[in-house]
């Protein structure tokens, strides 16, 4: 039986950080990463710890511009999306696949986390809609993301879908602006944009 729909999506603040911590501590990559991977460069990331990553995200929650949005159902955090102006994500500047396409000032969506009990219930799509509105309200003119393309009829592990799926972004009005890959044998990664 599925859970009721998400009832609210709110910016991360220090007061909401314990709710997000409960979600992230369910396990998997969020428990270690704390959604800081794209905010650091290689060497800094290699030297990071789960406690340090948690402290970094907690500090980011104190900013006027939230580092992401939290989805709630019945006062429980069930989802997260990380979004910010692209320059906040240091790793994007040095990535071969995700390097800037041009000089357009974009905001980037880099990560989704959805509670195990709430997956396949529209939580990520609800977060995406809220992210579009949040970016628009804060002056963004273009939103960019780096989703995974799932072949029709196939499923992928949740751990591989943390960027969101291409179909979800296309349903929200995003279009593929480029496809990149490391080399001829690596997977192709779409880059999508939405003009706000």
PLM regions and their residue ranges:
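Conserved GNAT-fold acetyl-CoA-binding loop/helix
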Residues: 29-55
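Conserved acetyl-CoA-binding loop-helix of GNAT-fold acetyltransferases
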Residues: 109-114, 120-137
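Conserved GNAT acetyl-CoA-binding A-motif
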Residues: 128, 135-160
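C-terminal "cap" of GNAT-fold acetyltransferases
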Residues: 160-172, 178-196
């Amino acid at each position: 039986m599925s859970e009721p729909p998400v009832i609210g999506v709110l910016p991360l603040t220090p007061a909401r950080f314990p709710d997000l911590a409960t979600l992230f501590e369910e396990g998997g990559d969020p428990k270690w990463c704390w959604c800081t991977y794209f905010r650091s460069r290689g060497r800094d990331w290699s030297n990071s710890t789960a406690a340090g990553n948690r402290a970094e995200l907690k500090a980011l929650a104190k900013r006027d511009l939230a580092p992401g949005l939290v989805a709630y159902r019945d006062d429980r955090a069930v989802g997260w999306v990380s979004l910010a102006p692209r320059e906040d994500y240091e790793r994007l500047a040095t990535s071969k696949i995700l390097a800037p396409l041009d000089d357009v000032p974009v905001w980037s969506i880099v990560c989704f986390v959805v509670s195990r009990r709430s997956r396949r219930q529209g939580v990520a799509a609800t977060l995406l809609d809220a992210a579009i509105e949040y970016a628009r309200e804060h002056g963004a003119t273009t939103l960019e993301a780096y989703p995974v393309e799932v072949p029709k009829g196939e499923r992928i592990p949740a751990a591989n879908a943390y960027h969101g799926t291409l179909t979800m972004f296309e349903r929200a009005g995003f279009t593929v602006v480029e496809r990149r890959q490391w080399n001829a044998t690596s997977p192709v990664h779409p880059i999508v944009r939405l003009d706000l």
